[in-house]
UniProtKB/Swiss-Prot annotation:
This is Probable potassium transport system protein Kup. Belongs to the HAK/KUP transporter (TC 2.A.72) family. The lineage of its organism: Bacteria, Pseudomonadati, Pseudomonadota, Betaproteobacteria, Burkholderiales. GO terms for molecular function: potassium ion transmembrane transporter activity; symporter activity. Pfam families: K_trans, K_trans_C.
Length: 647
């Protein structure tokens, strides 16, 4: 007989009937404090885009001769990209589509899944879209540290061309140090992120202000006709430049993804009062400088200041890009943790690096994989401008998925009128698709990299998801109904022994294989038996009073369901404590045994996935982290019993 190994849920994501809503009702003072904290985390990526964005827009490779009209056209596109994509789409619309206060592609996917029946085609399409968007985020997590740090260190070339040969070694050294310190956590140094980024934004704002004071005519670029005329006059070349303009928007997704940490209001305040004004001042300042001195296009950001200030600016820019990289690395850790609980990624080691901040985690496998790929990218592409195409495709794809999932939420969850949803989402999608198409024109110049990486990641995640689905089907098809089995067992009960036995199960209605093997080999039944199932709800957090449900089957046998949100980490010690409180049952841990099933998965000709994907799933399953480590089960109280499972 073969049943599946205990996992989190019968379906990939369980829908709670009702759950307390997690919101951020911040008072004014708290909102301001959180706004400054958000400056150091949320806006690092988009805040460092001035280092390379306009430099790429005016690259000679685009084939557009320099002119004042070209400057006005590009700056106009930058202004309206901020207005439409960031301010209107993300800050005012998408951030409303939060999952109990939590943002991000997987949280939005979980919210959209509530609108589709389990197992339906619509449910599968939502899952595939969300997973692909998440996979493209990993491309962003690789390219952001590479292009950001590289562009900052390239400022040394402004000081002297002799320093060019040091750019790559210094960049690699900074990145290696950044990834090596992840295991120690960033709780202490993280307190400096906010002040450093505030200095950064004030600095780039003043740099731009100095330039626009000398040439205030650049403010005429707020007229959208300059952007429209530029695109019409330059046709294909203008469209290619549009793809480069998108670089000013990289990091916009972070405003939504990090919403759960700070809340909507602090992020909106930070964007409208500090970040957007400083960024626009810098971009308009670069444009004003171009009008006065076209030669500054070679490295406009660092040429905005006198030569004596270039080296301090390189230091500040490097610090800002490291902070931006840290934010995206932490985002990769958080998203991977969510993906594990939602059933898309195998269990892997997760270590909390702070006793006070639950969201600060470290994942060794993710960390070292990112470091390897980031170094490969830096050494392969060599210059920040060579990474521009790859960066744009990674981010635009994620943005399009976010727009599509938000459309489902607007129509089905918010019950907006179909015509209104079509108009709003149609407008946003038109802009998103224009940016994507513009970036796809440069697919051979590096745009292939995030697409290849995303496709490989998508294959692994969907293989894991579908493989677990086959295991659940196997358990249902071959399982023994729990109540009937216990009733039959109690008619001729085996010898009862002292102590408590807790069996993890994937299905509360079926007998876990570890229980069957214990009866078969040991011929005993503990005086107290618990069948425990851990389920993940499609909300970020669950209150402790809603976490445990217990059913007494009589004869000292209990069925327990423990529920967690996708931003939480299941903890056996906490579950035991809550069982004791909810049912007045006492546990002696030295007299309690935890039984797990350690299965061997075998690929067969049984209809399911393609044979090569089944073998890939078997390999992933055997190399996944141990359940006992994931649930924090004491090693000296653990009993593992093996079983063979065919898929």
């Amino acid at each position: 007989m073969s049943v599946s190994n205990p996992e989190f849920s019968e379906s990939s994501i369980l829908r709670p009937v009702e759950i307390s809503r997690q919101t951020h009702p911040h008072k004014k003072g708290a909102s301001i404090a959180l706004m400054f904290a958000a400056i150091g985390i949320v806006f690092g990526d988009i805040g460092t885009s001035p280092l390379y964005a306009l430099k790429e827009c005016f690259s000679p490779d685009h084939g557009i001769p320099f002119s004042a009209d070209a400057v006005y056209g590009v700056i106009s596109m930058v202004f309206w990209a901020f207005a439409i994509v960031v301010s209107l789409k993300y800050v005012l619309f998408v951030m409303r589509a939060n999952n109990h206060g939590e943002g991000g592609i997987l949280a939005l996917m979980a919210l959209a899944l509530r609108t589709a029946p389990n197992g339906s085609k619509r449910s599968l399409l939502i899952i595939m879209a969300g997973v692909f968007g998440a996979c493209m985020f990993y491309g962003d997590a690789i390219i952001t540290p590479a292009i950001s740090v590289l562009s900052a260190v390239e400022g040394l070339e402004v000081i002297s061309s002799d320093l060019t040969r040091f750019v790559l070694p210094i960049t690699v050294l900074i990145l290696v140090i950044l990834f090596f310190i992840q295991k120690t956590g960033t709780e202490v140094v993280g307190k400096l992120f906010g002040p450093i980024m505030m200095v950064w934004f004030i600095t780039i704002g003043l740099m731009g202000l100095h330039q626009v004071i000398q040439n205030p005519a650049i403010f005429a670029a707020v007229n959208p006709m300059f952007a429209i005329r530029f695109l019409i006059e330059h046709s294909l070349q203008g469209f290619i430049v549009l793809g480069a303009v998108f670089l000013v928007l990289t990091g916009a997704e972070a405003l939504y993804a990090d919403m759960g940490h700070f809340g909507i209001r602090p992020i909106r305040m930070g964007w409208f009062f500090i970040v957007m004004p400083c960024l626009l001042l810098n971009y308009f300042g670069q444009g004003a400088m171009f009008l006065a001195n076209p030669e500054t296009i070679s490295n406009p950001f660092f040429l905005m200041v006198p030569e004596v200030f270039v080296f301090p600016l390189v230091i500040l820019a490097t610090a800002a890009t490291v902070i931006a990289s840290q934010a995206v690395i932490s985002g990769a850790f958080s998203m991977t943790s969510q993906a594990i609980l939602l059933g898309f990624v195998p269990r892997m080691k997760v270590r909390h690096t702070s006793d006070r901040e639950i969201g600060q985690i470290y994942m060794p496998f993710v960390n070292w994989t990112l470091l390897f790929l980031v170094i490969v990218v830096v050494l392969a592409f060599k210059k920040s401008e060579n990474l521009a195409a790859a960066y744009g495709i990674a981010v635009t794809t994620t943005m399009i998925v976010t727009t599509l999932l938000a459309a489902i939420v607007m129509r089905v969850v918010w019950r907006w009128n179909t015509i209104l949803v079509t108009l709003v989402i149609g407008a946003f999608l038109t802009v998103d698709l224009a940016f994507l198409t513009a970036n796809l024109l440069k697919i051979m110049e590096g745009g292939w990299f995030p697409l290849l990486l995303g496709a490989i990641c998508f294959l692994f995640l969907m293989t894991w998801y579908q493989g677990r689905k086959l295991l659940r089907q196997n358990a249902v098809n071959n399982g023994i109904e729990l109540k009937g089995f216990i009733d039959a067992l109690m008619q001729h009960p085996p010898h009862r022994v002292e102590g408590t036995a807790l069996f993890l199960t994937a299905h509360v209605d079926y007998v876990p294989v570890s229980f069957l093997h214990n009866l078969k080999h040991n011929h005993v039944l503990h005086e107290r038996v618990f069948f425990l199932k851990v389920s993940i709800w499609d909300v970020p957090y669950v209150k402790d009073e809603e976490r445990i449900t217990l059913r007494d089957m009589g004869n000292g046998i209990y069925v327990v369901r423990a529920v967690y949100g996708f931003n939480e980490t299941p903890d056996m010690g906490q579950i035991i404590e809550l069982i004791e409180k909810s049912a007045d049952l006492k546990f002696d841990m030295m007299n309690t045994s935890f039984f797990l099933s350690r299965d061997t998965i075998v690929s067969t000709e049984i209809p399911g996935m393609a044979m090569w994907r089944e073998r890939l799933f078997c390999w992933m399953y055997q190399n996944a982290g141990r359940q006992s480590d994931f649930f924090k089960i004491p090693a000296n109280r653990l009993v593992e019993l093996g079983a063979k499972v065919e898929i």
